[in-house]
Amino acid sequence: MGRMHSRGKGISSSALPYKRTPPSWLKISSQDVEENICKFAKKGLTPSQIGVILRDSHGIAQVNSVTGSKILRILKAHGLAPEIPEDLYHLIKKAVSIRKHLERNRKDKDSKFRLILVESRIHRLARYYKKTKKLPPVWKYESTTASTLVA
């Protein structure tokens, strides 16, 4: 799938392992993995950061193969899931930082243009998440209140 606002084609990606069973050398039980996920979520880490930590320091390549469910599902089951989906949150964070930059540098036309692109991506993602009921139907992105969503 191509990029939305650039020329890149986005071809390269990592290949998922063929075996869906946990490796034989992995001695951690699924309950231990769930406890670790909850512990990291309480520290304030995002689901992707939790996955990176589990992969790098605990040797768990795919949480789904060990526990049978994905990180976000485990977080939802324990009531620790973020209220705004992670990709939307990071786009809002980017828009807030560009807006802050534009307050200091009013003549930066390129940043103004990039802000328009980022905000259009935010609106598109929000529409998708409302359709799939991951966001409430009355949720709306407003640039004035965006900094409170990120903080």
From Swiss-Prot:
The reply on keyword Ribosomal protein is yes
Q: List the disulfide bonds.
A: none
For this chain's UniProt record, which GO biological process terms are given? translation
Q: Is Ribosomal protein found in the keyword set?
A: yes
Recite the UniProt keywords alphabetically: Ribonucleoprotein, Ribosomal protein
The Gene Ontology CC terms held by the record are: cytosolic small ribosomal subunit; nucleolus
Q: What does the record give under GO molecular function? A: small ribosomal subunit rRNA binding; structural constituent of ribosome
Q: Mind telling me which InterPro entries this protein's record contains?
A: Ribosomal_uS15, Ribosomal_uS15_arc_euk, Ribosomal_uS15_N, uS15_NS1_RNA-bd_sf
Name the family the entry cites.
Belongs to the universal ribosomal protein uS15 family.
Read off the HAMAP family from this record.
Ribosomal_uS15_A
Q: What is this protein called?
A: Small ribosomal subunit protein uS15
**Coding gene?**
RPS13
